[in-house]
Amino acid sequence: MRAVDGSADRWTREVAARWRTAADDVSTLLDRVDRLGAELRERPADLVVCHGDPHLGNLLLDPDGRVWLIDWDDAVLAPRERDLMFVLGGVLAFAPVTPAQQAAFFAGYGPVDPDPVRLAYHLGVRALDDIGSWARDAADTDRPEAERVRALKIVDGLLSPVGLFTLARGALRDLGRWD
């Protein structure tokens, strides 16, 4: 990081500072997700069609009040917790899912008994993927400055007290898996 600080542009230095601050937690989360992954491989789940990215930004409400799920480019066969993490854990720092929204979702989705270990695993994977990709975008000198600024703001949101990284850490704490 010292080399980055001495020779990099402002946005690379900014994201490097965030990364330095979060490095121990990122490393711990990676370790915990790896352990959960190994544990979950020993007890496979039923696979269902998952959207892969069903956050509020991928929902449309039509004039008749029907909800449409758009942007299916991340669709995958996976345990249902892969999508349920968006409703039960939330992934957008600026738009946490409320209990009323969860109730409305499950009224349409139907009864389900999600596995908290799978939820924590998928939250952790998503948090690691997001922090890595958005930090990379913020440091990418080939990107326009506005995109880099936006990426840095998203990194800040991920690491915020209500951000996805914090949610993933909380899910692991709830399981007794975060010291």
Name the predicted role of every residue range.
Residues 19, 26, 124, 148-152:
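Hydrophobic packing residues in well-ordered alpha-helices of helical domains and bundles
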Residues 26, 54, 61, 127-133:
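Hydrophobic alpha-helical membrane segments, chiefly transmembrane helices and signal peptide h-regions
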Residues 81-114, 124-142:
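Active-site activation/catalytic loop segments of kinase-like enzymes and analogous catalytic loops
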Residues 7-18, 66-72, 84-90:
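Short, flexible active-site loops
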Residues 34-85:
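Active-site acidic catalytic loop and adjacent metal/ATP-binding pocket
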Residues 1-51, 174-176:
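An alpha-helical support segment within catalytic cores of ATP-dependent transferases
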Residues 2-7, 97, 117-120, 143:
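Phosphate/dinucleotide-binding and metal-coordinating scaffold of catalytic cores
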Residues 10, 132-179:
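ATP/Mg2+ or Mg2+-diphosphate-binding catalytic cores
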